[in-house]
Amino acid sequence: MGETLLTVQNLSAWYSEEKMILSGFSFSLAEHEVAGLIGLNGAGKTTFLKVISGLLPTFRSDGICFCGTPVDFRKQDFKLCRYTVFAEDNSFSYFTFREYLAYVCAAYRKSMPDASELVHGFHFEEYTDILLRELSTGNRKKAFLITAFALKPRLLLLDEPVNGL
């Protein structure tokens, strides 16, 4: 394994003070390591991903480090290092796949990659110029996964990545 990529110590997260979703969750991930979170519905897997993605501000932790440096999930420099594909995503419904990929690359300050091998590997050739809202759940998921893999972020977070495929 490589260097430690992400360390989260004693993370607690909630949507309301009365309902704690995560309590005392610790996690460490090495560079190039693949890890999966397994748990019952409502166990907090998606909540954990929302915290790391900077989408859930109601959390506390004893320490969060990215590549050995303390990090704030909501800061721009960390956002540019990670990409998240959520289980259900109806964002960017008026974009085609090509437009979405170009938009994401611009947001991440990366040049437009050649995603043709990924498009071919996902059997997605005929869908690249169709609005995301017109795609099936599975093909919309493919569009987001192709974008994620083409972007090559240091930290890739996938919530139920094979649902709908």
Q: What feature does the model see in each segment?
A:
Residues 149-150:
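ABC ATPase C-loop
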Residues 58-78:
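Conserved ABC transporter NBD signature motif
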Residues 53:
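Helix-to-loop junction immediately C-terminal to a conserved catalytic motif
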Residues 156-160:
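Catalytic Walker B motif of ABC-type/P-loop ATPase nucleotide-binding domains
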Residues 38-40:
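The feature captures the beta-strand-to-loop junction immediately N-terminal to the Walker
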Residues 145:
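Hydrophobic anchor residue at the start of the ABC signature
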Residues 1-31:
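A short, flexible loop at the N-terminus of ABC-type nucleotide-binding domains that lies
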Residues 112-128:
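Conserved ABC ATPase "signature" region
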